[in-house]
Amino acid sequence: MHGEITTLQDYVLDLEPEATDLYCYEQLCDSSEEEEDTIDGPAGQAKPDTSNYNIVTSCCKCEATLRLCVQSTHIDIRKLEDLLMGTFGIVCPGCSQRA
């Protein structure tokens, strides 16, 4: 650009398209490797669907509020709920030191 006022001639308009390499350099893995990836577990069963659950309960000794985050299946979290509603209790770190 020359001067204070820009004109169309100041811009380069004679751009040429560049050649682009369209060759794909991706390497595919063997079909035997793919089969190994699809097998989950020793019996070839798929892993169960798990989720994170936040549990708020109280210490069975001092009644302090305890917060836990666990990863479990829906069925197993129901089993834990049954345990917590029964005689199963969780002890806070302070009470575990005193025991």
From Swiss-Prot:
Q: Where is this motif: Nuclear export signal?
A: 77-85
**Does the record bear Kinase in its keywords?**
no
Q: How is it modified after translation?
A: Highly phosphorylated.
Instruction: Name the coiled-coil region(s).
Output: none
Q: Which GO terms describe its biological process?
A: DNA-templated transcription; symbiont-mediated perturbation of host cell cycle G1/S transition checkpoint; symbiont-mediated suppression of host innate immune response; symbiont-mediated suppression of host type I interferon-mediated signaling pathway
Report the principal subcellular site: host cell
The entry's cellular-component GO terms read: host cell cytoplasm; host cell nucleus
Motif position, LXCXE motif? 22-26
Q: GO: which molecular function terms?
A: DNA binding; DNA-binding transcription factor activity; protein domain specific binding; zinc ion binding
* Transmembrane region(s): none
Q: Which Pfam families match?
A: E7 (PF00527)
Q: Which residues lie within the region annotated E7 terminal domain?
A: 1-41
Which InterPro entries does the entry link to? Papilloma_E7 (IPR000148)
The record's subcellular location field reads:
Host cytoplasm; Host nucleus
- Record keywords, A-Z: Activator, DNA-binding, Early protein, G1/S host cell cycle checkpoint dysregulation by virus, Host cytoplasm, Host nucleus, Host-virus interaction, Inhibition of host innate immune response by virus, Inhibition of host interferon signaling pathway by virus, Interferon antiviral system evasion, Metal-binding, Modulation of host cell cycle by virus, Oncogene, Transcription, Transcription regulation, Viral immunoevasion, Zinc, Zinc-finger
Zn finger residue spans: unnamed: 59-95
This protein's record includes keyword Oxidoreductase:
no
Q: Give the domain section of the comments.
A: The E7 terminal domain is an intrinsically disordered domain, whose flexibility and conformational transitions confer target adaptability to the oncoprotein. It allows adaptation to a variety of protein targets and exposes the PEST degradation sequence that regulates its turnover in the cell.
Note the subunit structure. Homodimer. Homooligomer. Interacts with host RB1; this interaction induces dissociation of RB1-E2F1 complex thereby disrupting RB1 activity. Interacts with host EP300; this interaction represses EP300 transcriptional activity. Interacts with protein E2; this interaction inhibits E7 oncogenic activity. Interacts with host TMEM173/STING; this interaction impairs the ability of TMEM173/STING to sense cytosolic DNA and promote the production of type I interferon (IFN-alpha and IFN-beta).
Q: What does this gene product do?
A: Plays a role in viral genome replication by driving entry of quiescent cells into the cell cycle. Stimulation of progression from G1 to S phase allows the virus to efficiently use the cellular DNA replicating machinery to achieve viral genome replication. E7 protein has both transforming and trans-activating activities. Induces the disassembly of the E2F1 transcription factor from RB1, with subsequent transcriptional activation of E2F1-regulated S-phase genes. Interferes with host histone deacetylation mediated by HDAC1 and HDAC2, leading to transcription activation.
The entry's family comment says:
Belongs to the papillomaviridae E7 protein family.
Which HAMAP family has this protein been placed in?
Answer: PPV_E7 (MF_04004)
Q: What is this protein called?
A: Protein E7
Per the UniProt entry, what species is this protein from, by scientific name? Human papillomavirus 35
